[in-house]
C-alpha cells in the first residue's frame, strides 16, 4: 500500500545524528551537515588552533609534521606555534630572531615569522608548560635570556596551555591521571626548581641589566626544564643564550625608552679588495648614519681597508637591527651583497655583537671572588662569554662566571675577558698554565692567562700600616705569593731567597693588568 510521503516541516532544524550509515543522499547530507556544525563549533571555540589540512605546499611538510606529532603522542590539531624549538625542523637565526632566513618546512604564523632549531622532542607537559597566554604567537625556546612569565599554579592561563586540540579548556582529570605516572614526577621537580630560582634570583642568571630577565629559569647556567647539552655549544647551535624572547626581541620599549640589543659597532668581512671608504659608506648608508673604520686607519691614511675587513660605527642602534634584517643567513652567519667598481654583488659577512653575549653566570650561588678571577688576553672578538666559560670549565672546572670586556661607548669587545672560579685549585691551575688554546668553531687561538688585578686592594702584609693607608700597587702572581704588596712590603718580602725573581703585576687606572718585566717561575 502506498503511503503518502510526509515532508518534514521547513522550519524544523535537522537533528545531528552521532552514528548513522549514509544509505541515502538525504542521510548523507545530514551527516555532512552535522560534521560541518561540529567543525564550526570546534573552530569557533579554539580559533587560534587551525585544523591541519592537506598542505598545498609539498608532501615533505606533512611528513615532517607527522613525525613531530607522533613523538608527542599523535595529538592531532595542535597549534604549530606552540611547538617552537621542540623537535620541529627548521633553522633559527641566532642573531636576529625576527629575520626569516629561508623558507623552511615550518609554516610560521603570519605575525612574527621565524624558524627554530631542531632539538629532541619533549613530552607534552614540557611542551606546553611554557605557554603563557591563551592566544599568543610567542615562542618560548631553549634560550637563556628568555623573559618567561609563568602564571600562578592553578590559573586558567596555565591550565589552558595544557588543553588538547579538541577544545578542552580545563585539564581533563581522567586524562591527567593517565599522564601522572609518566610526567608528573619530572614536572614536580621542575616546578621546585622554578620556585628555587625565584627565591634565589642570582642562581644561574646572566648579568643582564634589563628588568625583563627577572624570571629567568636558569639553574647552574642551564634551563631547569630544557637542559642544554655541551654538544650544542660545540656544534655552534646554542645561542645562549639568546634572545628570542628577550624584552628587546621586537624592538620593545620599557618605560618609554627603547632597549638596545646590539653594539653600534659592526664587523664587516670579505670586502672587495678595490672598495674604498666612500663606497663602503654608500653601501650601508641606507640603514642610518655611520662612520667606516679599520685598525690603524689614522696612521695608514689609506682609503682602502688593508685586510678586507672594516668596522661600521652607526649613530643609532636601530640601524644595526635594520642591517641584520636585510641580511641573508647561511650556516649561522649573516651576509649582505656589496658592490665595488670591479665586483658586483659580492656577499660580505656581517658580524654584529649582541650585548647579551658579554656576560654569563654559570653558577650564581657562588660569590664572585676577585682573587679567584683570571684575566684572559687576546680573546677573539667573535667569542662569547658563554663559550669562554664552557672552555675554561672543561679545562679547569669550577667556573662560576665569565665576561667579555667591552668599550664603554660602543659596547664592542676589546679582545679580553675575565673568568671567575669557585675554588682556589682551579684558579691556580689556570694561572699556572699561563697560556690557553681557545678552540670553538672557526676559532683556534692561543691566549694568555694572568691573575685579575684590582687597583683598590690594601697590602696583604701591613694592611696599609706602612704605606699610609694607600692601596697596594703591586700584585705577585707567583703561586707561592698571590698577594698584594705596597712598595715597602714588596721590597722586604722579595728580598728573601727564592723570591728575588718574582715580578709584580700592576693595574693602572682602568687598564687591564700589565706585566712589568715579569718572568713566570
Swiss-Prot record:
SMART domains for the chain: RRM (SM00360)
Up-regulation conditions: Not induced by kainate.
Domain RRM: residue ranges: 264-355, 372-454
Disordered, as annotated region: 1-35, 50-88
InterPro entries registered for this protein in UniProt: CEBP_ZZ, CEBP_ZZ_sf, CPEB, Nucleotide-bd_a/b_plait_sf, RBD_domain_sf, RRM_dom
Listed transmembrane segments: none
Alphabetical UniProt keywords: Cytoplasm, Phosphoprotein, Repeat, RNA-binding, Translation regulation
Main location: cytoplasm
GO CC annotation: cytoplasm; glutamatergic synapse; nucleus; ribosome
Subcellular location: Cytoplasm
CDD domains: Bbox1 (cd19757), RRM1_CPEB2_like (cd12724), RRM2_CPEB2_like (cd12726)
Phosphoprotein found in the keyword field: yes
Compositional bias per record (Pro residues), positions renumbered to this chain: 1-11
Composition bias, Low complexity: 12-35
PTM annotation (Phosphoserine): residues: 21
Function, as annotated: May play a role in translational regulation of stored mRNAs in transcriptionally inactive haploid spermatids. Binds to poly(U) RNA oligomers. Required for cell cycle progression, specifically for the transition from metaphase to anaphase.
Family: Belongs to the RRM CPEB family.
Name of the protein in question: Cytoplasmic polyadenylation element-binding protein 2
Organism lineage: Eukaryota, Metazoa, Chordata, Craniata, Vertebrata
Gene responsible for this protein: Cpeb2
